[in-house]
Amino acid sequence: MKIAVVGIGVAGGYLLSRLKNEHEVIGYERMKEENHDSICAWGTSANEMRELCKKSEINFDDFIIHHGKDMHIDMNNNERFDIKLKGLVTFDKIGLIKKMAEGVKIHYGVTPKLEELEKEFDMIIDCTGFYRSYLPKIEKDFFLPTYQYKIQYDGKIPIDDFFVKPFSKMTGY
């Protein structure tokens, strides 16, 4: 079967890794290769990711950057508390996606029209996240806005764990 996977984030990368040995699979990513980034959710459950990656013969531990010990919560009412963590890690998301996509042709910097894909492929899988490039929008969908920071530093790590500060009225974090 000839399959197009559109959106090469974690979901698209994972599908490429699972399908590439049994099908002709081609990936499409709207970002140019040199700008390819995968936003949001760099923290994940190590145990679940190990199991998923094992199905693609990938060692997830090779991509772990940090094992979380505590999650520091800073509420808007100046209440602060910590949650002990077990298995929450940050990982090299782009490195993992590239490993999953090894050996697959990917067209970067393009968003093909659905009609073009339908002419060439037996199946089209939309992995474009909440953009839903080819799927209808979900009525009454719920989005929780977040800010995520990558911290650049010299010398000692300025913060060694997860930090969450909810927005006022708990409308995001």
Describe these PLM feature segments.
Residues 1-4:
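Extreme N-terminal starter segment of soluble prokaryotic enzymes
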Residues 8, 98-173:
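Predominantly flavin-linked oxidoreductase catalytic cores and closely associated redox partners
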Residues 19-20, 40-43, 138-141:
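Short, glycine/charged-enriched secondary-structure capping and boundary segments
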Residues 44-98:
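A conserved beta-strand/loop capping segment in the N-terminal third of enzymes
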